[in-house]
């Protein structure tokens, strides 16, 4: 029997209709895995050995009672076959410390999804720089004058912090906007933090597409998140409307280009953000949108994931 651990935000507070981690747990349970639940505070190191307080878990698709804890135990993380790291951002120093603990378990043979070192290496906004021919025009800087010059060149740009999620603190700055200076100062904290600027992509009106990649293989359907009511942002957390659809030709091209690199880095479950035919983000920490896609199309993305995990464990 496969022992699967999950590190996640409190399960009592999730929305099971939308929660991808919950979908993963349902599929793992369907396959007869033993489920071990952990939150960040449950992980610890003692003399270099990664350990945790875990609670065995059962889940069900029931809006009144979707989980039940069984026994509680202190275990070596190496006793688990696989651990899903599904803690949502912020990707802060605490998150990084947790990846070091998980890496100790990985060195003792536990499969970690996604690979701890790659979680640290691949910032969701910055990692697109390794595929620069696929992205919009992009500037990463702390320098207000550089941001202003980039804006003057393109006339209509998007500016965002490097550590946001769910569309937080994303600004669209159009030609002639008198606020460019204060937006640059705010995002860079007066030149003390890096931020990103990209040329505005009009294709956002047709949706910001979340394309999932499982162990290097693109999922054939994506979720287009369409901005509502004059918004620039399609993120569901910012009120965007989700519309599942098949991948376009350019979606396939991008996912097939990026996929092998993700697989080689141990990034087994990844969400690409694509606007039109441009790659804007590579989400590695806790990608979502599985439930929305699975509700519309006859596909089990969590099944693809568990197949990939089983294949890796069999090696």
Swiss-Prot record:
ATP binds at residues 151-207. Belongs to the prokaryotic GSH synthase family. GO terms for cellular component: cytoplasm. Pathway: Sulfur metabolism; glutathione biosynthesis; glutathione from L-cysteine and L-glutamate: step 2/2. Mg(2+) binds at residues 281, 283. Residues 125-310 form the ATP-grasp domain. It comes from the Bacteria. Pfam families: GSH-S_ATP, GSH-S_N. Keywords: ATP-binding, Glutathione biosynthesis, Ligase, Magnesium, Manganese, Metal-binding, Nucleotide-binding. PROSITE patterns: ATP_GRASP. Its cofactor is Mg(2+); Mn(2+). Binds 1 Mg(2+) or Mn(2+) ion per subunit. HAMAP family: GSH_S. This is Glutathione synthetase. The gene is gshB.
């Amino acid at each position: 029997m496969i022992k699967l651990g999950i590190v996640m935000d409190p399960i009592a507070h999730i929305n099971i209709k939308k929660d991808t981690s919950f979908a993963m747990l349902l599929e793992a349970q369907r396959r007869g895995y033993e489920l071990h639940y952990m939150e960040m505070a449950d992980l610890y190191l003692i003399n270099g050995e990664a350990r945790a307080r875990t609670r065995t878990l059962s889940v069900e698709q029931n809006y009144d009672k979707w989980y039940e804890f069984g026994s509680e135990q202190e275990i070596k993380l190496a006793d688990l076959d696989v651990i899903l790291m599904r803690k949502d951002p912020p990707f802060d120093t605490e998150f990084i410390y947790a990846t070091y603990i998980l890496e100790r378990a990985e060195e003792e043979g536990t499969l970690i999804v996604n690979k701890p070192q790659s979680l640290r290496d691949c910032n969701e906004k910055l990692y697109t720089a390794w595929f620069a021919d696929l992205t919009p025009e992009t500037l990463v800087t702390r320098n207000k004058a550089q941001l202003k010059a980039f804006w003057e060149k393109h006339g209509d740009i998007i500016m965002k912090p490097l550590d946001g999620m769910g569309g937080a603190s994303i600004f669209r700055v159009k030609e002639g906007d008198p606020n460019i200076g204060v937006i640059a100062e705010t995002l860079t904290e007066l030149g003390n933090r890096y931020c990103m600027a990209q040329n505005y992509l009009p294709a956002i009106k047709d949706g910001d597409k979340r394309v999932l990649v499982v162990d290097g293989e693109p999922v054939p359907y994506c979720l287009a998140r369409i901005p509502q009511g004059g918004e620039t942002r399609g993120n569901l957390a910012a009120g965007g409307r989700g519309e599942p659809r098949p991948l376009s030709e350019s979606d396939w091209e991008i996912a097939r280009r990026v996929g092998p690199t993700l697989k080689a880095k141990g990034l087994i479950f990844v969400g690409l953000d694509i606007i039109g035919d441009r790659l804007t983000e590579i989400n590695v920490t806790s990608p979502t949108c599985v439930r929305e896609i699975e509700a519309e199309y006859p596909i089990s993305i969590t099944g693809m994931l568990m197949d990939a995990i089983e294949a890796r464990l069999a090696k």
